[in-house]
């Protein structure tokens, strides 16, 4: 991936996920924010992604995690700002994910850490003192979309990222890195996650378009049936409105080369 493509990915992600106030701040010269504020904001964005299942389950142990949110974020903030991984990012990452002080499972930790680095990857050049990390060492955030991609690639068959074990996670991590080594499109796992995320969005849209096309075909068949039975539908305002919308939708569908 060339530098222009990489920057486009970063800019699009910032545009989609950062609030208006922070998007404005990032364009300011001189900067009106401290590095710590921006890093804290990145972690605050990553946190909801990590605890989505925790909030849904709402068990007593998970409630403890929610109550310790600020302590957990501070723990990761301190590690990131100190570049605590040194020369061995994988070992540091494993130790962080294995931390049981706050009741966090390995799978939840990986999501929080990896999403935090995804945000930092996008804004590192906006910091006065950049985080000293080789982003090629970073891991892909495991979620429903990336696990589906890993399933399709034969890397793993697990379905729940929040319950991943350390051994399962390491197999996935290594499998993803092997895929990257054989892929000239991306340089690291974070770039791959951007593309997997986009591909999933495209697939969802195409699926909806396909369903829409099938539904329109069925609607046309039903209307033809009533007309064949002698019902006067042309003077029915509701039916006319539906037919007009069908014509518009057909134009959109015609643009799709995937159907």
Where are the predicted features?
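C-terminal accessory module of base-excision DNA glycosylases/AP lyases that mediates lesion recognition
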Residues: 1-40, 90, 101-128, 132-210, ...
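N-terminal interaction modules that seed assembly of large macromolecular complexes
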Residues: 21-74
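Alpha-helical ds-nucleic-acid-binding substructure associated with the helix-hairpin-helix region
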Residues: 60-124
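Short helix/strand-capping connector loops at secondary-structure junctions
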Residues: 158, 176, 221, 225-230
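Long amphipathic alpha-helices with heptad-repeat character
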Residues: 209-212, 216-219, 246-249
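Charged, low-complexity interaction regions
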Residues: 211-214, 224-239
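Short, charge-rich amphipathic interface segments used for partner binding and complex assembly
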Residues: 232-259
